[in-house]
Amino acid sequence: MNCISDFFTYETTKSVVVKSWTIGIINRAVQLLIISYFVGWVFLHEKAYQVRDTAIESSVVTKVKGFGRYANRVMDVSDYVTPPQGTSVFVIITKMIVTENQMQGFCPENEEKYRCVSDSQCGPERFPGGGILTGRCVNYSSVRRTCEIQGWCPTEVDTVEMPIMMEAENFTIFIKNSIRFPLFNFEKGNLLPNLTDKDIKKCRFHPEKAPFCPILRVGDVVKFAGQDFAKLARTGGVLGIKIGWVCDLDKAWDQCIPKYSFTRLDGVSEKSSVSPGYNFRFAKYYKMENGSEYRTLLKAFGIRFDVLVYGNAGKFNIIPTIISSVAAFTSVGVGTVLCDIILLNFLKGADHYKARKFEEVTETTLKGTASTNPVFTSDQATVEKQSTDSGAYSIGH
């Protein structure tokens, strides 16, 4: 029966006005902190009154310029930039290991790790290098034997140390970026209206002196990313050129401007002794008069640039404004919960406050009170002072 009785109960709020300087100051201080948080952080900093578009649409076109010297040759853009289409990801080659006049055939491996004494050491379980292992151990020189391969011969020797193209430090990168926020049908580009042809020809990007110049010097990009050019050019690496578009569309159109930042994207592989840096291979193919094909194999080390575009835009909208305002006013009530905890557990006279705040009323209690004191309400008023709030009692302190 007790379970049934407990189930069929009803709870209602009893309002108690506590006139205490301590709890009053705490209550107002908490309310002030909550209001300050919503006004300062939520509304002003996070702009919760705006609807935001994070689905930025972007296109990037790049162009590299500069000349360098490498292996007694003058290198231009067609020699050291790949791919040539001017995409958002491109590589500037700074060092190459060249293996010329390779033809299809049989030849010994040239690396020390393929050294052998007998054919049994050149089985298919051995990891191949420059081609398919034939299973034979052949003479590489008069003093060394290595496993034979079938493929492009002679095989590559990539353990030699080659110089780097130092002129690449002064190459320039031109970036043309266009963005669009589809929710607001807002379009803009990094070539700002105040840039002239004269400015484009002579300006170089600098985060303070020329933050909107679209032409970047390679050496500056490497420096802004916290890297050493000579070391990076020798081993290769991947750098990120980040263009951020964070726009408040409640402001003027010309205040939506790009912000450039730079970082190394392969920082983890840089510390690896297994495969540090960045390199790749490609070949140039030729044919002799008799129709035989041969090629020049190039192992290229270079700096890969990834142009990364990100951003979001915000604009005033009544719906998020109402939602944020309601959340702010509702959160003010959190102060009441905190003050109740302090009032009922930590302040002097906590038991007295608990007795006033929580009261259990049953039908038996009401009948007994009514029979012994017909003017119960008026008598109670002599003990407790009725406040101006409806249904509230004031407890002095």
Swiss-Prot record:
Q: What is its main location?
A: membrane
Q: Where are the transmembrane segments?
A: 21-43, 323-341
Q: What InterPro entries does this protein's entry cite?
A: P2X3_purnocptor, P2X_extracellular_dom_sf, P2X_purnocptor, P2X_RECEPTOR_CS
Topology in the lipid bilayer is annotated as: Multi-pass membrane protein
Cytoplasmic compartment spans:
1-20, 342-397
Judging by the UniProt lineage, the source's domain of life is: Eukaryota
Q: Which GO terms describe its cellular component?
A: axon; hippocampal mossy fiber to CA3 synapse; neuron projection; plasma membrane; postsynapse; receptor complex; Schaffer collateral - CA1 synapse
Instruction: Give the observed phenotype of the deletion mutant.
Output: Mice deficient in P2rx3 lose the rapidly desensitizing ATP-induced currents in dorsal root ganglion neurons. P2rx3 deficiency also causes a reduction in the sustained ATP-induced currents in nodose ganglion neurons. P2rx3-null mice have reduced pain-related behavior in response to injection of ATP and formalin. Significantly, P2rx3-null mice exhibit a marked urinary bladder hyporeflexia, characterized by decreased voiding frequency and increased bladder capacity, but normal bladder pressure.
Annotated disulfide bonds: 107-153, 116-137, 122-147, 203-213, 247-256
Positions bearing carbohydrate: 139, 170, 194, 290
Known regulation of activity: Has high sensitivity to ATP. Fast activation by external ATP. Exhibits rapid desensitization. Sensitives to the ATP agonist:alpha/beta-methylene-ATP. Subject to allosteric inhibition by AF-219. Mg(2+) and Ca(2+) slow deactivation of P2RX3.
Q: What's an example of a GO molecular-function annotation for this chain?
A: metal ion binding
Quaternary structure, per UniProt, is: Homotrimer. Forms heterotrimer with P2RX2. Heterotrimeric P2RX2/3 has a ligand dose-response profile that is distinct from either homotrimeric P2RX2 or P2RX3.
Q: Which family does it belong to?
A: Belongs to the P2X receptor family.
**What is the documented function of this protein?**
Extracellular ATP-activated non-selective cation channel. Plays particularly important role in sensory neurons where its activation is critical for gustatory, nociceptive responses, visceral reflexes and sensory hypersensitization.
Return the protein name.
P2X purinoceptor 3
Q: What organism does the UniProt record list as the source? A: Mus musculus (Mouse)
The root-end lineage is: Eukaryota, Metazoa, Chordata, Craniata, Vertebrata
